[in-house]
Amino acid sequence: MPPGAGGRLSRARAAGGLLRDPTAYFARRRRALGETFVVDAAGHRLLCVFSAEGVRSLYGFAEHEASFGLATFELIRRKVPEDLFAGRRNTPHDLFGRQETERYLGSLEEAMTIEIEELGSEGQFEVFSEARRLGHRLGLGSWAGVEAASETYLRRLVPLFDRLDGSEAFVRPGRTLLTTATGKVLERRAMHGIERVIAEIWAGRRSGGEERDDFLAQLYRSFDDIAPGERDVQVARDLILIHMGSQSNLYAALAWTLVNLLLDDDVMARVRAGEDGLLERCAYESIRMAQRSITLRQVLRPVELDDGNRTYTVDPGVMITTMLSVTNTTAADGLDHFDPAHYQGRRLAPSVVLPTKELVSTFGHGIHTCPAQRFSISAIVIAVRRLLAQFDFEARFTDARPRSRQIGGVARAEEPCVVAYRSRS
């Protein structure tokens, strides 16, 4: 057994450290115990790996040996009603293929036109709050129809999705205790509220005789074999999981891209000048810097894990774990600061030399790769490009730091990042 396993006091200290600052906690344990160690916390045994060989081994397990899906579900189910997962027919992998993503581009542009009109000619906003609303508009406009991106429906849907937000289990782990204590009554109420709004959008489209071959229509076709009332419910629940999956990282990644540009005059000038591919590289670099994802594999059958020094037999029930924020900024020289030159397209540049590629991640590796990667990057690039074309910005902040308590997903900001804007026309 690697070092770190302990008794009740050790488990209590681990839980406290993880809640206060997960990244700093894992980094301290790594310095004290080495590249492979055990943490017992919150009823789980975590086998933590940070060596090149150990992290590569984590990503190499087959799903039936050590499950990524079950490990993630184990965290999300604490926040989301269990009946939301039953009967799903349309998954992110189904909807985010290369050809499918191209269908979203027009919807993203339409959603941005609505958002720019809502912002008006001048004002100010907090970047992460605005990005959250914008992320909802971009996502819902893409798979719930352009109607959902309108202010009429968006102002009803946003608070419902925010209440149901499964990423809260990662961003603010302590709040999950309240969800458990209340039996998820507020989350279930939000789920039913979204079901009613989606049914209303579809009914309005049908009563107006409108035929539109978008993803909302595709979702409804996939449930053609069930009664209309139940069909509305099942379509809405597919849509909820798809939207929640994209929003867990999209809006924070969008916010950090804009924040990093506002803090770097040189890169901002190059983006405004239209340097080819630069905005995409800024998005990937912003995600790399802000990643707080904890990668988990729940062991289902005994597996052998090689960390480069020795091989461990890992029993079922153990979570094999690494945390991206520990390695993303330390795996090679220069990765501790923002520089879009670290990327060529969606891959790290040849100048970034790593012991293994898995030590740095934005959207995951192998079966961990986020299916919404192309959609998310397209959404970020379109949104930031349209905002910069329309407005001049003045940052009312001089620094931005990731939220220290976050475990999972792309970080939210520790402090508000307020900007003033004025139309360029």
Segments from the language model and where they lie:
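Cytochrome P450 heme-thiolate "Cys pocket" and heme-binding signature region
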Residues: 345-385, 390-396, 403-410
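Cytochrome P450 catalytic core segment centered on helix I
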Residues: 160-228, 324
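N-terminal membrane-proximal hinge/A-helix region immediately C-terminal to the signal-anchor transmembrane segment
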Residues: 1-75, 359
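Conserved cytochrome P450 K-helix E-x-x-R motif and the immediately C-terminal K′/meander segment
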Residues: 15-28, 275-312
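Conserved cytochrome P450 K-helix/beta-meander segment immediately N-terminal to the heme-binding cysteine loop
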Residues: 322-351
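Cytochrome P450
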Residues: 41-45, 48, 52, 71-112, 119-141, 148-152, ...
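Cytochrome P450 catalytic-core helices
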Residues: 238, 247-272, 371-391
